[in-house]
Amino acid sequence: MNILLVYKEADIATYKMLEGLSKLEDFNIYIASPPIVYRTKKIYGNCTPLDLPVITSKFNWNVIRALREIIKTYRIDLIYSPSSSGLSNALFASIGTRAKNIAYRGTQAKLKRFDPTYYLGILNPAVEHVVCETKDIEEYLSRFIARKRLTTSTKPFDIDWIKEAVRTPKQADDIPDDAFRCIYIGATKNRPFKGLTDLIHAFILLDDPRVHLTIVGEYGENDFQLAQQSKVSAQIHFLGQRSDAISFLVTSQLFILPSHRDASPRVVREAMACSVPCIVTDIPGARDLIIDGVTGLLVPPSSPQKMAASIRSLIDNPERLEAFAKASREHIIQDFSVKAYTDGFATLFRSIKKA
């Protein structure tokens, strides 16, 4: 079976899945991407890299022409396109060929049935199957797409992916050695749905000199001023965008996700892999990553009061916090296996090929 990945740049979970498939006798894996992608990154397993012009839009003639040549030359059976622009170009390129198109949906953004642009991609009848990141996304898409054409496959996480961060732990300046260290990682500038304002209000309500919060990621001026003008300003540390963000997780005792909506944030997996318990808002997708009362706690979104109370409950119960930390890492190892993720795709691809 000949599988083609079409993407500007896939994440490590997708590459690792393809690596696993490439080692199976019945799979030949081809990765079509701009040369700069695979020349600066390791190509995993027995995957074959193929040149593709940069995808700049949902209809790019040079990309379509190159993809069509690849489809014919390598007798492609299935095309997996994790990005919307890649999917649209692949759909055009595969017209009149035997190649079947498989899409990926990792966002909870709403679809518009009467918006023609969606029929260039995920709502196109030529899309054979859609892989959904979460059950909530699958449930929503079932309003538009037959359930038999939908599958949920949540991305895995391997603890090996945090080895470098573990080797190089970091901590914000001016945090006392005996402080209780909380952390949030995320880009929140112009994204109020990320809930950073709620998290800052929770710390103001908490008003505990023992507790410090490190915020990593691009932030808005309003949130910065809210923290700076509060009585806990010395306990909230804004680091901005950092390429080494995970290294700050390693030295933290609690990760907090205050989002109002967020599909399946990778950072929660990273925290658990680092043995850091999580407080997560009870929202679709994100809530499925933790086990409430075992690896962390769920709190209602937009509720600084409940968030503050949950933080305090873990500060005051170090034994429970330690149990959460241990269970978090075990949860990642047991329930977010790359092998299980790969096996799921192998089964899916085989069934689509036979259909």
Model-based region annotation:
Residues 277-280:
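Short hydrophobic beta-strand element within catalytic cores of glycosyltransferases
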Residues 306, 313, 320-335, 341-347:
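A short, well-ordered alpha-helix in the C-terminal region of glycosyltransferases
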Residues 292-293, 297-304, 313-319:
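Conserved acidic donor-binding segment of nucleotide-sugar-dependent glycosyltransferases
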Residues 4-6, 174-194, 200-203:
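Conserved donor-binding/catalytic core segment of Leloir-type glycosyltransferases
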Residues 12-19, 190-205, 269, 305:
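A conserved mid-protein helix/loop that constitutes part of the nucleotide-sugar donor-binding site
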Residues 32-37, 185-189, 212-224:
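Glycosyltransferase donor-sugar binding loop
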Residues 81-87, 105:
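Short His-centered aromatic/hydrophobic patch
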Residues 241, 260:
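Aromatic "clamp/platform" in nucleotide-sugar-dependent glycosyltransferases that forms part
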